[in-house]
Each structure stands twice: as structure tokens, then as C-alpha cells.
Amino acid sequence: MHFHFSKMHGLGNDFMVVDCITQNVFFSQDLIRRLADRHTGVGFDQLLVVEAPYDPETDFHYRIFNADGSEVEQCGNGARCFARFVRLKGLTNKYSISVSTKKGKMILDVEDDGEVTVNMGVPEFEPNKIPFKAKQKEKTYIMRAGDKTLFCGAVSMGNPHVVTVVDDVDTADVDTLGPLLESHERFPERVNAGFMQVVSRDHIRLRVYERGAGETQACGSGACGAVAVGILQGLLDESVKVSLPGGELHISWQGPGKPLFMTGPATHVFDGQLSC
């Protein structure tokens, strides 16, 4: 099997992006794991696959696979790179691009300055739709992780997120708590774990331990989930700067029932081809 690919990143969250419209490529879980290896493969956090639309009302179908080969529902940083990729490769000349995903639809708007704004849809807080095991919907849940008691928010941005507020992200025990939360029994499909430091009402710092990928330089859907939880808990205003290890995103949300918007960069690194 021979195919072309692009390497891209959104704030250091890096991707291998493959056009599966003009190329016939099949990715097994084992192949994805081998390609994701940073020593013996291409190296990436996620594989992004561009497919022809499943829905006639959309332009493309967007699939995401983590480095462990598991397919996931959403990746916000990947969505921005997806939009740049389909324009760079001449698959569309639109500036507003509609895509379907495993969990729904998104609109990707390419800005004049090269940044991309993504309509991430309406944040979902109903426990059974996240999914999250809870008797009823709450703004804050008490959870045990190892020997720690955590006060967390839970939300789906098309994929599940748990968010806990910390005093300082630099000293947060992400290496220990991240894996414990990722595989916590209350999240039957596992979860992305966000550790949020509130700097001010319009600025947070964030680290994210991603389901199936570990801690990454940036997580777009994680930034969205953290801001949504922060606004719901009364900690943040409607427009928030999110500082991640890899850079900054801007998130805006007018509250429950409204769509949430994320704006940030998408960088093309190089093109390559593989035979495997």
C-alpha cells in the first residue's frame, strides 16, 4: 500500500493527515500504532482521515484515530488542521467547510489570517449523554482518584471531558491523576482529563491528559470543555483565552443551549509518502 500524507499540528498537538478521497488507504489499528511511534514511525498524537461526505448536506467526513489505534469522536485541534488541509490540497476552495464526524456535524471557518474558527456545537452536560455515571446532572461532582478527592465538572464536546480546577498547572500531578481519571469507572468510554488554573475571568491555563494519547501540547476540545465547565460553575466570562503548553486558543460561549466557538492556528509542517 502506497499513499501520500501531510504532517500538521495545532499548537503542538500533532497529526498525520491523509486524503482518503483520492487515495484508497486502509488503516488497521496495528498500522496506526506503528505509524504513530515517534522512534520508528512518522510520529503523531492523532491520525486524521479525510473521507467523502456521508451526508449530502456536508462537504466531508472527518475521522480521528488516537495513537493507540482507537477511533474517537472529536478533536478540535485536528478540525482546524482538517480545514487547512482540504484547502491546501485543492479538495475544496470554500472558506466555510461543513464536516460530519462520528458524533455529529461541525462548521469550520478559515479566517483571512490563516486561523480557523470551529463551531464545536452545544456542550452536553447530561451525564448519560457524556457518558458519565451520576444520579443527576450537577455543576460539580466529587470523585476519588487514587488517594485524592477531586471536585470535577463533566461535559461532552462530542467526546467526553472531565475538568478539575487546580491552583497551579505547573505543579498539578497530571502524570498520576491523568491516567487514573482517563480510565475511571464512572466514564464507561474513558475520558479526557483537563487540569484548569483560573488566572482571571477571561484567562485560564490548561493541561490535558488525552484519552488514548496521554498528555499533549494542546487539546482543542479539552480547551472547549474546560471553558464550558468554568462558565457553568460561574468562574469565567463568555470569552476566554486558554493558555496551553503549545500556545493559545480563544473560546467563546454564551451559555447553556448555545454553540461554543474555538479559534486558533493550524500549521502545515511537511508532506510525505509511505509504502507499507
Curated annotation (Swiss-Prot):
Site residues by UniProt (Could be important to modulate the pK values of the two catalytic cysteine residues): H161, E210
Pathway field of the UniProt record reads: Amino-acid biosynthesis; L-lysine biosynthesis via DAP pathway; DL-2,6-diaminopimelate from LL-2,6-diaminopimelate: step 1/1
The free-text function statement in the UniProt record for this protein reads: Catalyzes the stereoinversion of LL-2,6-diaminopimelate (L,L-DAP) to meso-diaminopimelate (meso-DAP), a precursor of L-lysine and an essential component of the bacterial peptidoglycan.
Report which superkingdom the organism of origin falls in: Bacteria
Give the PANTHER family listed for this entry: DIAMINOPIMELATE EPIMERASE (PTHR31689:SF0), DIAMINOPIMELATE EPIMERASE, CHLOROPLASTIC (PTHR31689)
Annotated positions for site Important for dimerization: F270
Source organism per UniProt: Vibrio parahaemolyticus serotype O3:K6 (strain RIMD 2210633)
One GO cellular-component annotation of the UniProt record comes to: cytosol
Q: Which GO terms describe its molecular function?
A: diaminopimelate epimerase activity
Q: What's the protein called, per UniProt?
A: Diaminopimelate epimerase
**How does the annotation summarize its subunit structure?**
Homodimer.
Tell me which residues bind substrate: N13, Q46, N66, G76, N77, N159, N192, E210, R211, G220, S221
Where does this protein reside within or beyond the cell?
Cytoplasm
Catalytic site: C75 (proton donor), C219 (proton acceptor)
**Record Gene3D superfamilies:** Diaminopimelate Epimerase, Chain A, domain 1
Question: What family does the database annotate?
Answer: Belongs to the diaminopimelate epimerase family.
InterPro entries linked to this entry: DAP_epimerase_AS (IPR018510), DAP_epimerase_DapF (IPR001653)
Q: Which UniProt keywords apply?
A: Amino-acid biosynthesis, Cytoplasm, Isomerase, Lysine biosynthesis
Give one GO biological process term: lysine biosynthetic process via diaminopimelate
Enzyme Commission number(s) from the entry = 5.1.1.7
- What does the record give as the reaction this protein catalyses? (2S,6S)-2,6-diaminopimelate = meso-2,6-diaminopimelate
According to its UniProt record, this protein's enzyme class is isomerase
